[in-house]
Regions:
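Sec/Tat signal peptide C-region and signal peptidase I cleavage site
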Residues: 5, 13-20
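Low-complexity repeat regions of mature extracellularly deployed or surface/particle-associated proteins
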Residues: 20-205
């Protein structure tokens, strides 16, 4: 079991503002890991890799990452958050990325069975992407603000995809479920003024 907690803050006491440009990379393996990363400010990059990672183009060998809980919290603008587990021995995980601010990009790449991935973004011009494979998974993206984009790309059976977008401006949701994917469901809710668009593609056996 691994427990990692990272908190990065750079605060000016005179201006009460946060500045950043920090990079955090967490690579771990093993069952029952608990990882929490919090960043405040702008221009930060966060990468969390459980079981296998390729943040710097070098790979960690595939290992068990069952029953992991991974949480990333971002407060600021122009940040990137990326969380990944790949292909094998990665069941019963809970992944979450929470973002407050504008122009942020969040990705969860999660594989295997009985997992939950959630991205929550509050602000404007934010993008979110969830990639997943395996069975009996739940994928959620919740966005509040102006001009949001959400994308789901899955290779899964018996899974649920939920997207909620609220606010003014242009919102877009893209859902793609690949060939040989059965018994899945999609729920898309879009509220507010402006253009709303949803593209949903299902392919079964």
């Amino acid at each position: 079991m691994v427990r990692a907690i990272t908190l990065l803050l750079l605060i000016s006491l005179h201006s009460i503002q946060a500045f950043a440009d920090n990079t955090v990379v967490v690579q771990t393996k093993g069952s029952g890991s608990s990882i929490t990363v919090q960043q405040v400010g702008s221009g930060n990059v966060t990468g969390v890799y459980c079981g296998l990672g390729s943040f710097d183009s070098s790979l960690v060998n595939t290992h068990n990452c069952d029953n992991a809980t991974i949480g990333v919290s971002i407060d600021g603008s122009s940040n990137i958050a990326y969380a990944q587990s790949v292909w094998s021995n990665h069941d019963s995980q809970v992944w979450s990325i929470t973002v407050d601010g504008n122009d942020n990009y969040a990705v969860i790449d999660m594989d295997q069975d009985d997992n939950t991935a959630t991205i929550i973004q509050n602000g404007n011009d934010n993008d979110a992407l969830i990639l997943g494979s395996g069975n009996n998974n739940v994928y959620k993206i919740e966005q509040t603000g102006d001009d949001m984009y959400a994308k789901f790309q899955t290779f899964a059976d018996n899974s649920d995809i939920w997207s909620t977008q609220e606010g003014t401006g242009n919102h877009n949701v893209f859902v793609f479920n690949s060939n040989q994917a059965d018994n899945n469901s999609t729920r898309v809710i879009q509220k507010g003024s402006g253009n709303k668009d949803a593209d949903i593609f299902w392919y079964n056996d």
